[in-house]
């Protein structure tokens, strides 16, 4: 206890501390609350912290610092500012490759993000163009299917269903038209009523044969030696009679099929 009161055996330190005013020297010591221990800083106390500037106090503080360091009561002094700066610079130089790798990784991540955003923008643009073309195709299809140009707008499913039904109706109509045409062609190719014996047998002279044919055929409507009608006229008359029985829609489809047959 006596050694502690004697300031670790440093002569003149107690007298110098008593001679220094308390108000001026209080700024050099850290603030301590009641019941707390006061610890000295781990580095020498600069001269500027002491406003009293007593030579004895300064010398006593230096001796106290040296004695405490030798006794191991306080930790070793920190390196000087130049040493600290050199160590920090060496640490920065050692960590510089990692910093470079991190910066490269950061730049590569930013580049990948920009490229991915550009790819997403191009994909969205292609999708918008595709949807636009699909809508234009359905709009053109609605104008060709029955009841497609009505005030009520058909949905895509209804438009496709109407188009399928319309195509099937056209196929049935074309099949019926082909059957009628085949039947008409078969009727025209069958042999007609054979001519009379008088016209079939050869006579002595052409003049007598013509007179006998003229006498036996009272009217030109009979099938004698009269000149037969052309197959085209008979086909056109029968086709006109068949066309008269068709509905307007069937007539339109028939005209469409005849137009397709021309190609």
From Swiss-Prot:
This is Achaete-scute homolog 2. Induction: Up-regulated in activated T-cells after immunization. Keywords: Developmental protein, Differentiation, DNA-binding, Neurogenesis, Nucleus. CDD domains: bHLH_TS_ASCL2_Mash2. One of its GO terms (biological process) is negative regulation of T-helper 1 cell differentiation. Pfam families: HLH (PF00010). It comes from the Eukaryota. The ASCL2 locus is imprinted in mice. Maternal inherited gene is expressed, while the paternal inherited gene is imprinted, hence silenced. However, the paternal gene is expressed in some trophoblast cells in early postimplantation embryonic stages and almost completely extinguished by 8.5 days post coitum (dpc). Efficient DNA binding requires dimerization with another basic helix-loop-helix (bHLH) protein. Forms heterodimers with bHLH transcription factor TCF3. May not heterodimerise with bHLH protein HAND1. Residues 110-121, 202-220, 230-247 have a biased composition (Low complexity). Disruption phenotype: Embryonic lethality between 9.5 and 10.5 days post coitum (dpc). Abnormalities in extraembryonic trophoblast cell types; by 8.5 dpc, the ectoplacental cone (EPC) lacks diploid precursors and by 9.5-10.5 dpc, the spongiotrophoblast layer of the placenta is missing and the labyrinthine layer lacks normal highly vascularized organization. Unexpectedly, does not exacerbate trophoblast phenotype at 8.5 dpc when combined with simultaneous knockout of basic helix-loop-helix transcription factor HAND1. Residues 104-126, 194-248 are annotated as: Disordered. Expressed in follicular T-helper (Tfh) cells. The keyword DNA-binding applies. It is found in: Nucleus. One of its GO terms (molecular function) is RNA polymerase II transcription regulatory region sequence-specific DNA binding. GO terms for cellular component: cytoplasm; nucleus. Transcription factor. Binds to E-box motifs 5'-CANNTG-3' in the regulatory elements of target genes, probably as a heterodimer with another basic helix-loop-helix (bHLH) protein such as the transcription factor TCF3. May bind both open and closed chromatin, acting as a pioneer transcription factor to allow other factors to bind and activate lineage-specific genes. Required during post-implantation development for the generation of some differentiated trophoblast cell types. Residues 118-170 form the bHLH domain. The keyword Nucleus applies. Coiled coil: none annotated.
């Amino acid at each position: 206890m006596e050694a502690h009161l004697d300031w670790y055996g440093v002569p003149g330190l107690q007298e110098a501390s008593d001679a220094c005013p308390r108000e001026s020297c209080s700024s050099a010591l850290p603030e301590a609350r009641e019941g707390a221990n006061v610890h000295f800083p781990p580095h020498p106390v600069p001269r500027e912290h002491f406003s009293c500037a007593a030579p004895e106090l300064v010398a006593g503080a230096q001796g106290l610092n040296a004695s405490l360091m030798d006794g191991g009561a306080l930790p070793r002094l920190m390196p000087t500012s130049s040493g600290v700066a050199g160590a920090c610079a060496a640490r920065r130089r050692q960590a510089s490759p990692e910093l470079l790798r991190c910066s490269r990784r950061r730049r590569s991540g930013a580049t990948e993000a920009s490229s991915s955003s550009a790819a997403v923008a191009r994909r969205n643009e292609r999708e918008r163009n595709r949807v636009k073309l699909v809508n234009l195709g359905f709009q053109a299809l609605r104008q060709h299917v029955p009841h497609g140009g009505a005030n009520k707008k058909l949905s895509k499913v209804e438009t496709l269903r109407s188009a399928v039904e319309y195509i099937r109706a056209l196929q049935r109509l074309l099949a019926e038209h082909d059957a009628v045409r085949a039947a008409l062609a078969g009727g025209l190719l069958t042999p007609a009523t054979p001519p009379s014996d008088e016209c079939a047998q050869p006579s002595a002279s052409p003049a007598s044969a013509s007179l006998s044919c003229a006498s036996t055929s009272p009217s030109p409507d009979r099938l004698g030696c009269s000149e037969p009608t052309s197959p085209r006229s008979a086909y056109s008359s029968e086709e006109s009679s068949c066309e008269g029985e068709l509905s307007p829609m069937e007539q339109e489809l028939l005209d469409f099929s005849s137009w397709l047959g021309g190609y």
